[in-house]
Amino acid sequence: MDEEDPNLFTEFVDGLNGLLDDTFSKDDYVPIWKEITENVDKFNQPGIFTALIGYEWTPAPTGDNLHRVVVFKDDAKIAQKIIPFSAIDSNKPEDLWNFLKEYNSSTGGEAISISHNSNISGGRMFPLENSYGEPIDSAYANMRNRWEPLVEATQVKGDSETHPTLSPDDAFADYETWEGNIGRSQTKRLVRISNTGDCKDPLNYKCYKYKEEEEDRYIGSYVRSGLRRGLEIEKKIGTNPFKFGLIGSTDNHTALAASEEDNFFGKFLDSEPGPGRVDSCMAGCGRPVNMADGEDIPSGDLWRNWQITASGYAGVWARDNTREEIFDAFKRKETYATTGPRIAVRFFGSWEFTEKDSFDPNFVEVGYEKGVPMGSDLPLRETNKSPNFLIMAAKDPNGANLERVQVVKGWTNKDGSSSEKVYDVDLSSDAGSSTVNAETATYKNSIGESQFVSFWSDPDFNPREQSFYYVRVIEIPTPRWTTYDSVVFGNKLPKFIPRSHQERAYTSPIWYSPE
């Protein structure tokens, strides 16, 4: 076995995904699922601590991550009427969505899926084709929008908002960027060039021969490009398949929901705090590397622990702290993502807001009365005005100040392509400065602002262009978790590991469609 073969992980994952149904009996799952669901019910305290039943669907064909998280609105009694649909059953998202449809109709319950870790999907999370190699049509778009209303924009395996290759004019695009797919087996897009016999499954790499294409793999892997691709597809077929809201999540496999940079407990047990975790390999694979001597990642290894991200959390504007209300907020996409800080952010769109509304003490009530919240569509345009927006962002009470509030806009062009632009809506007077001391892993809240309340109107609005808008909130610079580790454990970090970063929040979009 060649330990430096970059395809080892691909073959390993394919082996897992290719397990025959009779390898494990469905009956084996019943007591496990019963124990899990009843344990969740045991700790669910409506109004105090809400625990949602869920599981992860985990296909990764050719090492491309297509994972989804399935979340239930229901209690154990209803959830136990089914056995979870797994990647052994199918690696096609359409089959998962059909399973969710059947669950809803047969049990009277309700469940949705949330796409997970798109940045390492090899361009497959927001594709141009369905799982059978056919162009996306309205049936696919409607099914996906119904059963998969949310996308995870940030987590421990990197940030999925955008990539500097996709957004070269965005100064904040290169944040916790991962390259390649989950197994680091591919850095270029692989395209089918021939069919081998009667095998027609485009998600099974054994069915096709591949070649590397010079085009990068990023389109279809990142949230912003997915939103833009959705507009482009809508212009062709009349339906947007990627009209999703945003959340963040940890993806930690330790049951420790600790994403603070100074209290980060890693992804797996082997990446919990300790002197050697920074230069060890994620999931315990590979060999020790003295990164202080300048060596990065050997070609046969997976991701190094220094690359994992202390992220993220899901913000949900629910009417009450209960399963039912949180789930309903998921469905209406009134959600946002943060990379770890508990930033609070509101985002409303309207044709009728005025700057005076941003000073109203009943800001939130005005937002709902005169406009629509994040995750919504602007109503039909009845005036010649540009859309205007109200934004409120407040710092984590125990965290760093805020440096700026931005609106990210995407729109379609006459030729069917799409464009994007990032607008600075509000800036602190000292934006661009830093107080980080990497030697002591400290910073000061002597710069930035504790809160921004903003009114913004689109200065470039074209009523003929489909568009989306979402808010990005940027903190002042703070130490990265690896810097805290360096100080606590006395590790010497190589130069290529960032000492500081700027954490952030992303809201779900608000969409505009021409009449």
Q: Which residues make up each language-model segment?
A:
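A metal-dependent hydrolase metal-coordination microenvironment
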Residues: 1-109, 113-129, 510
